[in-house]
Curated annotation (Swiss-Prot):
Residues 536-550 are cytoplasmic. This is Hemagglutinin. Belongs to the influenza viruses hemagglutinin family. It is a single-pass type I membrane protein.
Length: 550
């Protein structure tokens, strides 16, 4: 189908942008649902299902907790002197030694996890007048009774348990972590059988701190055949400080110290398998890519991870506003420029031209405006990632039962942070999408105005994104318009002449239409006058009688 008003002496040039049959809905500041040609998902909503062992060093706890590995539970001896970036605790981990409790379990666990090492240095403590290396059938090491390898259970020697007073200075340049404990017998009889005194006492001091613990004899729930317990405590000795241990019974003594390191190591509870792969970000669900700025896989993360948000999806527009082409038009059909809809047939650029002239029809992309839009949009995802990625990890928070109110407050703070970031993410993406759509619309308008300035009075803006060119414009002429080398002065006289001729025809055609309408109106008027005159004449002659009743 030819373009209206197109013959060999004129041409039609339309400007437009590409479109797709099915676009993607995104959100902007002004519109919750606007269709664009292309968009990128910004929320990572799934994991790989496994924890990648690269680039972070992962230590699989298997069936040991970190504290059991620290104390030296016999079934955790494989972890002696190990190091890690992330220690993974499993849900099936269990203790298999003397029953114990750690009054400040969460703090000790976090402290050791962040240190990233179980490197242990044995020291020569001198324990005079007592029996060392106590063991229990609840803590088998092979067929023999055993105990925690990093602790030394001291009991009476013969019938005496003297007062112990031992010192150990820290002459190193790093902090030392000492683990020690207090034994709580199940009965008073057990107390005197092991330590002679009816009540023991343990005091551990440094220049900065002092801890004094009194054992509590009494029966407790049976665990691995025992109703007695050990309470585990810890002390950090700074460089130049000194450790002092004083006791008259019930002491579970240290055998040495753990080296303390500073770093960003951590611990995570997860049952995801460890696989051979590479990922910077780890969650309890498994590793996730960090090529997106947001994720809703898990709140707990380790490494350089996307920010956790509540949304399942946030789409960033990376294409222009999509206005699908009306399929009934054909290539040109009834003229269609960018004002009406996009062009689905244009695949080699975002913006372009369609023309019809004496040589036929054609289409070409405008690469300059296309590249300008692409350059401005490229890097949007990376810029959003830079604004939102956490270069640190979100650790698990643990609190004892007596710290329930602190735990509630911590949960409230974390939930508030998530709500805030979810809102920020929504606004950030909406702003970026608005900017993208405005930007791509602007490039289309720039191209249209550039073409208008070239053609000047040689063409007429048809109001729909097309120009009617009033001179013969072959393919070379069309190409000059596209590449900006068109000289309107060359065609000015021809265009002016053709414009008057075409407008004159349109004017005569317009007068004819007016005459027809006026003739029709006069004929109707005369018919009404004749009919009215006949009725009045008939009434006067008596042929028609008209009665009016009130």
């Amino acid at each position: 189908q030819d373009l209206p008003g197109t013959d060999n002496s004129t041409a039609t040039l339309c400007l437009g942008h590409h479109a797709v049959p099915n676009g993607t809905i995104v959100k902007t500041i002004t519109d919750d649902q606007i269709e664009v040609t292309n968009a990128t998902e910004l929320v990572q909503s799934s994991s790989t299902g496994k924890i990648c062992n690269n680039p972070h060093k992962i230590l699989d706890g298997i069936d040991c907790t970190l504290i059991d590995a620290l104390l030296g539970d016999p079934h955790c001896d494989v972890f002696q002197d190990e190091t890690w970036d992330l220690f993974v605790e499993r849900s099936n981990a269990f203790s298999n030694c003397y029953p114990y409790d750690v009054p400040d379990y969460a703090s000790l666990r976090s402290l050791v996890a962040s240190s990233g090492t179980l490197e242990f240095i044995t020291e020569g403590f001198t324990w005079t007048g007592v029996t060392q290396n106590g063991g229990s059938n609840a803590c088998k090491r092979g067929p023999a009774n055993g105990f925690f390898s990093r602790l030394n259970w001291l009991t009476k020697s013969g019938s005496t348990y003297p007062v112990l007073n031992v010192t150990m200075p820290n002459n190193d340049n790093s902090d030392k972590l000492y683990i020690w404990g207090v034994h709580h017998p199940s009965t008073n009889q057990e107390q005197t059988n092991l330590y002679v005194q009816a009540s023991g006492r343990v005091t551990v001091s440094t220049k900065r701190s002092q801890q004094t613990m009194i054992p509590n004899a009494g029966s407790r729930p049976w665990v691995r055949g025992l109703s007695s317990r050990i309470s585990i405590y810890w002390t950090i000795v700074k460089p130049g400080d000194i450790l002092v241990i004083n006791s008259n019974g019930n002491l579970i003594a240290p055998r040495g110290y753990f080296k303390m390191r500073t770093g960003k190591s951590s611990i995570m509870r997860s049952d995801a398998p460890i696989g051979t792969c590479s990922s910077e970000c780890i969650t309890p669900n498994g590793s996730i890519p960090n090529d997106k700025p947001f994720q809703n896989v898990n709140k707990i993360t380790y490494g350089a991870c996307p920010k956790y948000v509540k949304q399942n999806t946030l789409k960033l527009a990376t294409g222009m506003r999509n206005v699908p082409e009306k399929q009934t038009r054909g290539l040109f059909g009834a003229i269609a420029g960018f004002i009406e809809n996009g062009w689905e047939g244009m695949i080699d650029g975002w913006y372009g031209f369609r023309h019809q002239n004496s040589e036929g029809t054609g289409q070409a992309a405008d690469l300059k405006s296309t590249q300008a839009a692409i350059d401005l949009i490229n890097g949007k995802v990376n810029r959003v990632i830079e604004k939102t990625n956490e270069k640190f990890h979100q650790i698990e928070k643990e609190f004892s039962e007596v710290e329930g109110r602190i735990q509630d407050l911590e949960k409230y703070v974390e939930d508030t942070k998530i709500d805030l970031w979810s809102y920020n993410a929504d606004v950030l993406v909406a702003l970026e999408n608005q900017h993208t759509i405005d930007l791509t619309d602007s490039e289309m308008n720039k191209l249209f105005e550039k073409t208008r300035r070239q053609l000047r009075e040689n063409a007429e803006d048809m109001g729909n994104g097309c120009f009617k060119i009033y001179h013969k414009c072959d393919n070379a002429c069309i190409e000059s318009i596209r590449n900006g080398t068109y000289d309107h002065d060359i065609y000015r006289d021809e265009a002016l002449n053709n414009r008057f001729q075409i407008k004159g025809v349109e004017l005569k055609s317009g007068y004819k239409d007016w005459i027809l309408w006026i003739s029709f109106a006069i004929s109707c008027f005369l018919l009404c006058v004749v009919l009215l005159g006949f009725i009045m004449w008939a009434c006067q002659r008596g042929n028609i009688r008209c009665n009016i009743c009130i």
